Amino acid sequence: MKKRSCKRFSIPGTIIYYKNKPRFFGRSKYTNDYYPVINMSRGGVYFLCDQRLAVGAHLIVKINIPGTQTEPEIIANVKWISKNPEQSYRYQTGIAFHSYGDGKNKNSREILSLLKELEKRSDKKG
C-alpha cells in the first residue's frame, strides 16, 4: 500500500508484540515484551520499542487493540527505526504490513477489514 493512501489513527491502550518471521521451516516465539503503539494505519504501525530491530527485518506481529475481540497476526517489514528522545523506550520503530490477499506472505483480507473499521471508528471520535 502507498504510504499516503493510508490514514493514520491511534487507539489509546493499543500494544504490539512480535516475533521474527522464520525463513524456511521452523517456528519462532513471540517476545515476552509488548510495546505501545503510537499510531497505525491500514499500511503499518509506528510503535516504541527497546530493541533495535534491523531495517528490512521480516516480522510477524500481534496487535492487541482495546475494544476488539481479535488479536490479528500480521506479516510486516521494519521500514525505519530512530532513537526515542523520551526516556520511556529506547527506539521509535515503523513497520509496513505486507499486502493483503490470498497466498504466501500475504495478510488476510479480514485484517484489512478490521483496520478499515477501526479507521472509521477513529474518524467518528475525532
Language model regions located:
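Short strand-loop-strand
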Residues: K21-I63, G94
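A short macromolecule-binding patch
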Residues: G94, D102-I111
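Short coil-to-beta-strand transition motifs
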Residues: F9-S10, K29-N32, I65-I75
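Short beta-strand-centered aromatic/proline hotspots
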Residues: Y35, E73-S82
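Short, conserved beta-turn/loop elements at beta-strand boundaries and strand-helix junctions
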Residues: N20, R42, I81-Q87
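Short conserved beta-strand and strand-loop elements enriched in small hydrophobics
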Residues: T14-Y18, H58-E71
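Short, solvent-exposed secondary-structure boundary/capping segments
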Residues: L48-C49, N84-F97
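N-terminal helix initiation/capping motif
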Residues: M1-M40, S113-G126
